[in-house]
Amino acid sequence: MSTFAEAPAGDLARGEKIFKTKCAQCHVAEKGGGHKQGPNLGGLFGRVSGTAAGFAYSKANKEAAVTWGESTLYEYLLNPKKYMPGNKMVFAGLKKPEERADLIAYLKQATA
């Protein structure tokens, strides 16, 4: 399952658990909230990488100009450093396709 289109359907509850255990230490997912070590993910879908106001992004993140959506997040979350070399995110990624799909399902709801 190398693409989001081939991934299993995401589960919102499992995605929330993944967010709380693997993402929440560095990110919040609420529109209008502040940033932590990583940027606030509120309004993530449709946003271009490196553009959340008030966060000091890496040059790589700003220059990548990735528009975040299901497919781009699915690829990015597999291996963030490989997808966007030079970005600040220290997270190694989610290797299981179902975990990436679950997290994306949660993020779609939580960041809207």
Swiss-Prot record:
Origin: domain of life: Eukaryota
UniProt main location, coarse: mitochondrion
Record PTM: Binds 1 heme c group covalently per subunit.
PROSITE patterns, alphabetized: CYTC
GO CC terms in record: mitochondrial intermembrane space
A GO molecular-function annotation: electron transfer activity
Pfam families reported for this sequence: Cytochrom_C (PF00034)
Subcellular location: Mitochondrion intermembrane space
Keywords: Electron transport, Heme, Iron, Metal-binding, Mitochondrion, Respiratory chain, Transport
Residues the entry annotates as binding heme c: C23, C26, H27, M89
InterPro entries: Cyt_c-like_dom, Cyt_c-like_dom_sf, Cyt_c_1A/1B
Family: Belongs to the cytochrome c family.
Summary of the function given for this chain in its UniProt record: Electron carrier protein. The oxidized form of the cytochrome c heme group can accept an electron from the heme group of the cytochrome c1 subunit of cytochrome reductase. Cytochrome c then transfers this electron to the cytochrome oxidase complex, the final protein carrier in the mitochondrial electron-transport chain.
Protein name stated in the entry: Cytochrome c
Species classification: Eukaryota, Viridiplantae, Chlorophyta, core chlorophytes, Chlorophyceae
